[in-house]
Amino acid sequence: AELGKDSRRKVSTHRVDVGEPTQIREFARAAIAAHPGLNIVINNAGVALLGGFNEVDQAQMEWLVNINFWGVVHGTRAFLPHLSQQRAAHIVNLSSIFGIIAPPGQTAYCAAKFAVRGFSESLRHELSMANSPVKLSVVHPGGVLTNIVRNSRTGTGITDNARRAESIDRFDAIAKTTPPAAAQRIIAGIEKNQPRILIGNDAKFMDLLQRF
């Protein structure tokens, strides 16, 4: 909306459930019609779930994976045909530091974010082998100061209300990167065509650590 105040830019907004393929396809058609020169797609939707494997039920895990993983797949599939017709284009898929390491208490989130990483890295190779004009980057943010933890759902097996507050406090203590700084890092990564974009010193450290 702020960008729309600049008359040189055309901005359109759309409300979409990324877990619904039909909605994503309709969104892609509308976005391409409004912006025929569209050549960058960023799959960024994500949710969080508080609780270990035995504390979340199957429906909650499927809800998270449907958004965090399948939303990325649906968005990529919907826009890829159009992007492939451009002279140059880029897909950016958001994974996480938890797509690099897998701490306890994050089974659903890690499963989805590791899946995003694997999907993105494999597709990047496929696009390269096909000499496609579409490049692809996968982003691994560390602690970025957003509301994802505050807006998270709580596992059905958790009865201690204090755990949610503790989780928010821990996240706020380690989330040092601001959203604008994260956005600038992603833009720089696109410009350099980086396969893996790491955001924050914590992500860089964990990326290095998991190699040993």
Question: What are the roles of these predicted feature ranges?
Answer:
Residues S128-N201:
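SDR active-site lid
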